[in-house]
């Protein structure tokens, strides 16, 4: 090797050593800062209540927060501590649901740091119980599990257990007061995990008789240490809120070895629970001198005991003064800000769709929007029960001429099931309810993808009123039409002659051929939940979208009877549009209109059908939202019946 290369290698090695030493010294010079803490009411408000089946197959019924509070299973004591107990009054059927209990979990996941739990009382040494304070990653066992406090039945010494995937050995010569009974944490050699049996008095009845105590866990990328301090032996640095682990003394568990802790133990959520029997307590029930009602089955004996002896579980409760999370160089304020920004769950998000006067508008969806200013001439979907109950007919009137780029705002309020439905029945000679010159579809031969209020295409399908039917349907990328009676964009089949465009209140040109009824069905767009835009798993708030999935529904046949003296032929069509709901689904509302064509006297004499047609926008709404669907259908039915009788009489 050349001298220069040798010098370079030695220099690199020295530099690397200096950097490592500097980093270690910097870390050692740091002190733990309080990042997060819980006490009293915050356990109820800031932790999740788990109310599903027990993953450990226990004879237990985990209850939700509301039930737990009402039944007194969780509460804040007069001293300000958090109480979490079990039902100790009900005698149960061993073949029925298990004993009611509580399991709570942190809402966020946590990594390396110092975790301190001050416990006044833990579930006592009782046959059939399995209490635990533990943590687990999102992907078990790959992300690891840390059982900080765990015991079953009559045990009086805590058991500390680590679980992870693959092979993770901690058989190093580590100084600890507990006893290492298994050094393999990985699932490659079974599900036992690496186990440290704590000292007597660290769990159950002796722990409670001594007035409780404090457990502290220091978790780094190279080791996990756990200390137990009886109430009378809590270090001064812990009591002062400035923990110094170097003064803690010998830990009860020191787990370190060839295992890569940074790789094997990822972010964890913390859990406090009390279950009964199950995979551990039930299977070792006979080993604890607990009563065996069924000598052939420790599990059944455990279930029988738990079901038939409610008073035995009065002391099976947790009373926790506090849990505190400390991290190097992280203050409580900055940690709270980071937690709020990265791990909090958004319960409701206001989403705005800004629309431009183009056929293909963009649909920005800002994350966690809390307020959206509304420009002039904006229709807004109400999101509260009160708003839906008090909608006025102003929301369903004909559309005024728009002068700017209007917007459609849709607010989603979590799991609300409220629904806004707008239905319009027009008895005048109206075919289409226009929006504006810049955003209306052509009445005859116009662009089928013209935007509705700037949002491309309300879901529309029209019955053909010409000899060559051409029903058109267009899709929209974001929000659908809101509950506005005249704000539906419709496309009518092209007729012979010059195409006509319907604007805000006038028809620019008149078709040169009469419409002829050729169909008795109308297609409507149906909403597909799969098309709804979704947020991520931790944030809600999305814009409901729908694609056209036409289905056919019958409509009355077009009347061929002459109206007003038999001089015209009337043909009807219905257009459907989807109205968004806060839940992300939509319902279809129909807009029915009559197109009337009147030939001249000369045309009638010659048999040549060349007359003129008139299309006018409706001037008012017959009925508005707020009526039940049944009332709406009744109004449509009566109006339609009167119209048919009138036409028949004239004929």
UniProtKB/Swiss-Prot annotation:
Sugar attachment sites are 64, 200
For this UniProt record, the keywords arranged alphabetically read as follows:
Carbohydrate metabolism, Cell membrane, Cellulose degradation, Glycoprotein, Glycosidase, GPI-anchor, Hydrolase, Lipoprotein, Membrane, Polysaccharide degradation, Signal
Which residues does the Swiss-Prot or TrEMBL record annotate as the active site?
A: 145 (nucleophile), 150 (proton donor)
Provide the topology term for how it sits in the membrane. Answer: Lipid-anchor; GPI-anchor
Q: GO molecular function terms here?
A: endo-1,3(4)-beta-glucanase activity
Domain of life where this protein originates: Eukaryota
What is one cellular component GO term in this UniProt entry?
A: side of membrane
| GO BP of this protein | cellulose catabolic process
Cite the residue spans of the region called Disordered.
364-422, 508-557
| Propeptide regions on this chain | 630-651
Its chief place of residence is membrane
Q: Does the keyword Lipoprotein apply?
A: yes
Q: Where is the composition biased (Polar residues)?
A: 379-400, 520-535
- Comp. bias intervals (Low complexity): 364-378, 542-557
Q: Which InterPro entries match?
A: ConA-like_dom_sf, GH16, Glycosyl_Hydrlase_16
Signal peptide location? 1-21
Lipid attachment residues per UniProt (GPI-anchor amidated asparagine): 629
Q: What Enzyme Commission number(s) does the record list for this chain?
A: 3.2.1.6
Query: According to its UniProt entry, what is the function of this protein?
Result: Mixed-linked glucanase involved in the degradation of complex natural cellulosic substrates.
Under what name is this protein listed?
Probable endo-1,3(4)-beta-glucanase NFIA_089530
């Amino acid at each position: 090797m050349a001298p220069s290369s040798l010098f370079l290698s030695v220099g690199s090695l020295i530099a690397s050593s200096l950097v490592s030493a500097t980093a270690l010294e910097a870390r050692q010079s740091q002190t733990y800062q309080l990042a997060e803490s819980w006490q009293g009411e915050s356990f109820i408000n800031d932790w999740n209540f788990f109310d599903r089946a027990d993953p450990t197959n226990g004879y237990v019924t985990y209850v939700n927060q509301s039930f737990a509070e009402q039944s007194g299973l969780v509460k804040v004591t007069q001293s300000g501590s958090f109480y979490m107990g079990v039902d100790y009054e009900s005698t149960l059927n061993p073949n029925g649901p298990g004993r009611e209990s509580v399991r709570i979990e942190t809402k966020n996941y946590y990594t390396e740091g110092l975790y301190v739990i001050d416990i006044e009382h833990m579930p006592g040494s009782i046959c059939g119980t399995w209490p635990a304070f533990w943590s687990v990653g999102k992907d078990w066992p790959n992300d690891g599990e840390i059982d900080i406090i765990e015991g079953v039945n009559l045990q009086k010494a805590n058991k500390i257990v680590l679980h992870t995937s693959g092979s993770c050995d901690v058989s190093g010569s580590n100084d600890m007061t507990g006893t290492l009974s298994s050094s393999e944490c990985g699932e490659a050699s079974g599900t036992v995990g690496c186990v440290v049996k704590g000292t007597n008095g660290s769990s159950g009845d002796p722990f409670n008789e001594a007035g409780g105590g404090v457990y502290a866990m220091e978790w780094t990328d190279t080791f996990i240490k756990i200390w137990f301090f009886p109430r009378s032996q809590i270090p001064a640095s812990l009591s002062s809120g400035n923990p110094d682990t170097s003064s803690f003394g010998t830990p009860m568990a020191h787990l370190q070895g060839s295992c890569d802790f940074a790789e094997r133990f990822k972010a964890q959520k913390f859990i406090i629970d009390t279950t009964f029997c199950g995979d551990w307590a039930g299977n070792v029930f006979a080993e604890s001198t607990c009563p065996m009602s069924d000598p052939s089955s420790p599990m059944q004996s455990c279930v029988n005991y738990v079901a038939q002896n409610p008073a035995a579980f009065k002391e099976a409760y947790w009373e926790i003064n506090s849990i505190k999370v400390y991290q190097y160089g992280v203050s409580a304020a900055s940690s709270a800000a980071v937690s709020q920004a990265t791990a909090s769950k958004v319960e409701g998000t206001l989403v705005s769709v800004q629309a431009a006067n183009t056929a293909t508008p963009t649909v920005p969806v800002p994350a966690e929007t809390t307020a959206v200013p509304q420009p002039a001439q904006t229709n807004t979907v109400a999101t509260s029960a009160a708003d839906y109950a008090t909608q006025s007919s102003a929301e369903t009137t004909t559309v005024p001429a728009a002068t700017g780029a209007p917007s459609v705002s849709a607010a989603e309020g979590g799991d609300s099931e409220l629904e806004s439905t707008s239905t319009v029945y027009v008895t005048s000679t109206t075919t289409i309810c226009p929006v504006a010159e810049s955003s209306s579809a052509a009445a005859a031969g116009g662009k089928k993808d013209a935007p509705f209020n700037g949002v491309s295409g309300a879901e529309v399908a029209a019955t053909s009123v010409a000899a060559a039917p051409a029903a058109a349907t267009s899709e929209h990328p974001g929000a659908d039409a809101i509950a506005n009676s005249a704000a539906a964009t419709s496309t009518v089949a092209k007729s012979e002659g010059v195409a006509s465009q319907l604007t805000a209140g006038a028809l620019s040109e008149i078709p040169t051929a009469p419409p002829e009824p050729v169909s008795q069905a109308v297609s409507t767009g149906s909403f597909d939940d799969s098309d709804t835009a979704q947020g991520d798993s931790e944030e809600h708030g999305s814009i409901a979208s729908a694609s056209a999935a036409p289905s056919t529904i019958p409509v009355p046949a077009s009347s061929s009877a002459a109206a007003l003296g038999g001089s015209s032929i009337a043909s009807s069509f219905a257009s459907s549009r989807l109205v968004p709901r806060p839940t992300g689904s939509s319902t279809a509302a129909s807009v029915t209109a009559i197109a009337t064509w009147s030939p001249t006297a000369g045309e009638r004499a010659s048999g040549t059908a060349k007359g003129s047609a008139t299309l006018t926008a409706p001037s008012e709404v017959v009925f508005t939202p707020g009526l039940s669907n049944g009332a709406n259908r009744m109004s449509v039915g009566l109006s339609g019946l009167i119209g048919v009788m009138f036409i028949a009489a004239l004929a």
